[in-house]
């Protein structure tokens, strides 16, 4: 007789956004907002094994900003990040996760020489680029479930300038970044009130988003299930759309 996963104690992690889909009662989400939008209170923040990321040079020269994410996803709003950079006198932006030219869409983003595109990068190349950045420009137009781009950037000492959607208000406090849904306010803040410490950003990521904490919190979830309880009283389900959030130019 075949047995399904439901016949065994189990925990399911949901990393993405869903709409109108009933999920397993033992679902864990990756931020408080992510959980609440699915009618749940069960979440564990993603944690990284920072030893895998190598050494961070907190005294490195930082003379550009960066965007990190799948630029082809409209909700990541790389165009918004480019517009922010272009609105700041002399600012340069390095786009990690996208190309200037796309065969299907042509010249998608900008001809500006102040904007550089690096495609999908990883390893030492990615670490080096993040370590030289003054900040992540991240004006997403959806409810971000978590955002590894945020914690990775913070680890390398780069503050986060983003929109107040999804997990961002939970992850980005005033010591490590600034959130707004308006381009002009983001530009004005970066130009006139940039006060961020690479050391503070780095230590915050190390202390709050590490693999040890994540493992400990998952163990608590596993113990709850092994004791015969479910993580949610009902099957979690999101009923409110998670995209098309506002970005004012």
Language-model segments: residues:
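Conserved donor-binding/catalytic core segment of Leloir-type glycosyltransferases
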Residues: 41-48, 52-96
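Nucleotide-sugar-dependent
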Residues: 72-76, 141-148, 169-170
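A charged, aromatic-enriched C-terminal amphipathic alpha-helix characteristic of glycosyltransferases
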Residues: 192-248
């Amino acid at each position: 007789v075949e047995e399904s996963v439901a016949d065994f104690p189990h925990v399911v992690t949901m990393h993405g956004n869903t709409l109108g889909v009933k999920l397993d009662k033992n679902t864990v989400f990756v931020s408080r907002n992510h959980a609440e939008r699915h009618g749940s209170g069960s979440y564990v923040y993603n944690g990284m094994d920072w030893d895998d990321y190598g050494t961070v040079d907190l005294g490195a020269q930082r003379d550009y900003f960066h965007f990190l994410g799948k630029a082809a996803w409209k909700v990541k709003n790389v165009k918004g990040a480019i517009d922010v950079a272009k609105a700041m006198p002399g600012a340069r932006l390095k786009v990690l996760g996208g190309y200037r030219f796309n065969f299907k869409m042509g010249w998608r983003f900008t001809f500006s020489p102040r904007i550089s595109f690096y495609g999908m990068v990883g390893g030492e190349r990615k670490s080096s680029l993040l370590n030289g950045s003054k900040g992540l420009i991240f004006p997403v137009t959806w409810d971000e479930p978590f955002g590894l781009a945020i914690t990775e950037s913070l680890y390398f000492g780069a503050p986060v300038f983003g929109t107040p959607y999804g997990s961002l208000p939970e992850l980005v406090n005033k010591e490590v970044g600034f959130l707004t849904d308006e381009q002009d306010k983001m530009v004005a803040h970066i130009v006139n009130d940039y006060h961020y410490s690479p050391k503070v950003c780095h230590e915050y990521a190390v202390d709050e988003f590490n693999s040890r904490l994540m493992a400990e919190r998952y163990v608590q979830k596993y113990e709850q299930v092994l004791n015969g309880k479910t993580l949610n009283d009902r099957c979690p389900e999101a009923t409110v759309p998670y995209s098309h959030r506002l970005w004012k130019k």
